[in-house]
Amino acid sequence: MRKLFLLSILMIGVIVAFAGCVEESKTTTQLQQTTQSESQKAETQPKLGVNVVRYAETFKLYPHWDEGYCVVADSVGNKFVLVEGNAKAPNISDGKIIKVPVKRIVTDFYCPIISAADILNAYHHTIVGAPKYAVEKSPKLKELFDEGKVVDIGSPSKGVNYELIVNLTPDIVFLGDWKSEDVVEEKLKELGVTVSRFYTYQEPTYMGRVEWIKFAAAFWGSNAYKKADKWFENVVKVRENILKKVQNVTNEPTVVIFSWSKTKNMPGIYGNDSYYSKMIAEFKGKNVFDDYNRGYQYVDKETFYERAMNADVVILIWFYGDVKTKEDLLKINPNFAEFKAFKTGRFYVSHPDYYVWEARDPAGYMMDFAKMIHPELFGGDDDLKYYYKIK
């Protein structure tokens, strides 16, 4: 009886061990199949490669033009696979395939799409819709507008004509970073329209903002991209030459850069997070508001006057009209007469269309800043292109 009992226990142990081996074998097989499946999936998902963006932080770019495509990721992570000609589209997960060069573009701002077309002096015919104010900043696009080939789509702040946009059958619509544009994006997606977001004004550096030309040009194909890349490298060289000239500066002038609100009647300053402040620091100037971390913010007049009154250089960003003389400037605020920079001839005011040229001619725009901060190193400040020296 005892032997029978022991034999039964032994048989049960063998059965359990066998079952365990079977289950382990099954699990191993499943794991191998899963690993193989993931491996096969990885093989069908081409590697994006290297993000070639050098300065910008709000978009990514993976060019594979030799294989007929380029992958871009916009400011909110939307991924687009730009396929040229008859090239085979790669299988990029969550990537929207778009044939390039695109034929029908809608944009709600001047930069970076319209500015890129102006810089490259081409591709305006692909822009079929834009706000009228942006159209008027581009001579060629204005010409097409007058011919009825470009239409005014409205603007996020005043209202967008959704029906008109849909009827334009755009390949893609480009929107900026305003909160009102979040609503526009949601509505357009509901209508089945492809949308991309560009946060150019959130770039922490000026060169990062300028580099967006590569993003825009990629939608027009490899030739446009290569021209944009070459143009950008020339801008890089201008910046490097400026940095070389100021590298030995030890006496940094104090600088104020601000705007003045006509509606609020108060100053708004550009703090340490703005690309203006970073450019001033690079060119060996000292922004007196660099302890304000936000890019742009309003400050009370008392605080502003306390810091700005004795600054060596004062730069006013102004878009309400031309301000060329002391008389023009004092109409904005008579207290400016007490500023040190006003008395010494170091008070400067932007042209009202400055934002067009900081996108279209960054080399000239940077040189203006270099001359305003260190005129002694750059041949004086009497020949500025996009700022008025107040006299």
From Swiss-Prot:
A GO CC annotation given for this chain: plasma membrane
Record has Cell membrane as a keyword: yes
Lipid-linked residues (S-archaeol cysteine): C21
Topology term for the membrane: Lipid-anchor
Subcellular location field: Cell membrane
Stretches assigned to the Fe/B12 periplasmic-binding domain: 104-377
Protein name: Uncharacterized lipoprotein MJ0872
Native source species: Methanocaldococcus jannaschii (strain ATCC 43067 / DSM 2661 / JAL-1 / JCM 10045 / NBRC 100440)
